[in-house]
């Protein structure tokens, strides 16, 4: 299949800063790519790197792709490229080939349909505000708390306060972004192992400490995130929860097939994509919720500005860029 390859860059400012123990995000940049087949079928993809170093690498590699290229040659060329480029190209090819068919509408706009990221600076007051706004009708909510941003003594005190304030209708995900050592991680695991509000501890130890993560997973559900990106073979080996970010994996079609085949213990998470990448997030999240271990995705819905970049129609986004 002969293809026309096109790309356009984008940049936007998040409506609120997102901070974790490793970095923080104020703005997001990337590219929308468009593939047109010789029979006029169109596929869109999004190159959505999270870090500046990766952004520079992707810029150089995207410039190496010619405007006119055969599908086999394109697939061969991107094998050595950054995973975000591979993800975008494979996403667009999947759309052209009919491997994924997006719905006109997905239903993740309501607050309870996605995990809510707590403000780590004012975590207790933020929790109280959320409860006032959303819990008076008894709906289930899932909260995510980024930890390892303050000293552990202070965060343990906050944990105790949080646990005293949440009822059975609130689930909690605690994400250390790989910044704890084994002592602190085991301490939190011991505190939380019998707590029914906890969905999981997310990447509590550094990406390389697979033995430590495996031992922790025997005490309490552990969800791998960054470890999966560094060691993709863990996707087939890890027996616990997996935080999957399709725009960061080299081929989201693999994730699509896993969810279609009802693979358990997968949770879908954003890397702050535009509406192009969001189509994949919403489609995969819908499949996940129909699977054996349904969990609301982490889509950071309240962090995006009001912009055409987040429309549900790929063509409109492309035309306005």
Summary of predicted features, one role per range:
Residues 1-172, 177-179, 183, 190-194, ...:
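N-terminal capping/lid subdomain adjacent to the active-site entrance of alpha/beta enzymes
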Residues 7, 45, 172-175, 202, ...:
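General beta-strand structural signal in soluble alpha/beta enzymes
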Residues 56-58, 63-65, 156, 163, ...:
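Alpha-helix boundary/interfacial micro-motifs
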Residues 71, 206-209, 215-221, 226-321:
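Shared catalytic-loop signature of beta/alpha-barrel
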Residues 138-139, 196, 238, 263:
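Glycine-centered loop/turn motif at secondary-structure junctions
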Residues 149-172, 176-242, 247-248, 252:
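Glycine/proline-rich, positively charged
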């Amino acid at each position: 299949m002969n293809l026309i390859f096109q790309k356009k860059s984008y940049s936007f400012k998040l409506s609120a800063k997102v901070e974790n123990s490793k970095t923080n995000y104020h703005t997001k940049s990337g590219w929308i790519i468009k593939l047109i087949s010789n029979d006029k079928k169109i596929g869109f993809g999004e190159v959505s790197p999270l870090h500046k170093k990766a952004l520079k690498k992707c810029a150089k590699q995207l410039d190496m792709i010619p405007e006119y290229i055969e599908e086999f040659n394109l697939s061969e060329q991107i094998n050595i490229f950054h995973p975000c480029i591979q993800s975008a190209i494979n996403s667009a090819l999947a759309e052209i080939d009919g491997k994924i068919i997006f719905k006109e509408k997905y239903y993740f706009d309501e607050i309870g349909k996605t995990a809510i990221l707590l403000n780590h600076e004012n975590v207790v007051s933020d929790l109280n505000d959320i409860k006032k706004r959303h819990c008076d009708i008894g709906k289930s909510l899932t909260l995510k708390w980024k930890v390892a941003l303050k000293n552990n003594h202070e965060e343990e005190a906050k944990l105790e306060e949080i646990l005293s304030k949440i009822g059975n209708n609130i689930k909690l995900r605690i994400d250390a972004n790989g910044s704890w050592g084994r002592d602190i991680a085991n301490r939190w695991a011991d505190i939380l192992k019998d707590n029914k509000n906890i969905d999981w501890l997310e990447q509590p130890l550094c990406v390389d400490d697979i033995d430590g993560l495996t031992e922790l997973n025997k005490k309490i559900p552990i969800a791998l995130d960054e470890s999966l990106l560094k060691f993709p073979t863990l996707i087939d080996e890890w027996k616990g929860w997996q935080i999957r970010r399709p725009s960061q994996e080299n081929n989201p079609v693999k994730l699509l097939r896993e969810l279609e085949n009802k693979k358990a213990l997968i949770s879908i998470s954003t890397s702050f994509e535009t509406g192009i990448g969001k189509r994949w997030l919403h489609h995969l999240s819908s499949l996940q919720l129909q699977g054996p271990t349904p969990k609301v995705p982490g889509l950071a819905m309240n962090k995006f500005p009001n912009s055409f970049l987040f429309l549900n129609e790929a063509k409109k986004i492309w035309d306005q860029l």
